[in-house]
């Protein structure tokens, strides 16, 4: 009855179903015609532009279609042990700039933490009314706006956005991150200061539950690299991915550059987890699995365990999400079902690690909030030491 009364008030037929008033229909058809004319004009102008500037037109096509030009990753750095210790946030900045030299449509910025997050593109200027060609976006202390606008840029196409802040401040950006994951938009999040390694700023700024909380989000790929070289490969993975957002979780503090023999980091990180060092000439009795800054600790503990007669494997596991995508045969190669003795080491809540260590395994994690002290003291206090890892392994 209310619908009929509304139609009567407008002078429309009261019993017509799916009514489109003639004036509305005429208006919409005019809009369609205007749009078709505008599109035709745009294509004519772009065809002329393509004829005059073929290389720039190809760049434009690549940007809109998400195609990576040949050699886009040729300038990515690699690091030796002598380059360490190096914070993974610093290695991230170097990798980002190397990629940006080949991808002019890559742009982004930080929520007022650029000197700490290392997201600045050198020589690219700031985006703003005075310079729309600038590629550094100064978002201010507006994490949600930054993440939401980055999703909008990805939805439009033609731009590849990244957004940076402290890892703990993902709390302010989470709804926008969730929508990027829901809509499968390839936004890249650069989240630094990833643990109690933040130090004196204390528990308000130390992310404890954030890895577990964000790993629970469908479609969001988390990568927490162990060192500078894994960080470079994490950027390569993030750029290649087109079907959803990727979050790089990076250290404030310097971490060793880990020597790796064999196939190298690219293959390992592309699989989500890989055997970094294995038991010497024997099947492992114990598997130590870690991510990020705790991988170096796992390697130190392995040496002590090997010396005491425990055949120990170390697995670097930068990305649970990528590892879950691998075939069962590879997963069992990394975590043999007949090796139940497993110890996970990560500077965050232990929640979730049972998926990988099983009921017989153990986890060195932090299931309380942090504290204010130098990073080295905090790691010792919370049990991130060779002695504690060896004791837990036994």
Residue ranges and their predicted role:
Residues 1-142, 148, 152, 287, ...:
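Conserved acidic/glycine
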Residues 89-98, 148, 172-176, 232-236, ...:
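Short alpha-helical segments and helix-capping/turn motifs at coil-helix boundaries
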Residues 109-110, 139, 162-163, 189-191, ...:
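General beta-strand structural signal in soluble alpha/beta enzymes
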Residues 102-106, 131-135, 156-160, 183-188, ...:
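Short coil/turn connectors at secondary-structure junctions
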Residues 84-90, 225-232, 296, 323:
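Active-site glycine- and acidic-residue-rich loops that bind
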Residues 112-114, 165-167, 193, 252, ...:
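Residue-level signal for short, function-critical loop segments
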Residues 1-25, 107, 114-212, 230-233, 240-394:
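Thiamine diphosphate
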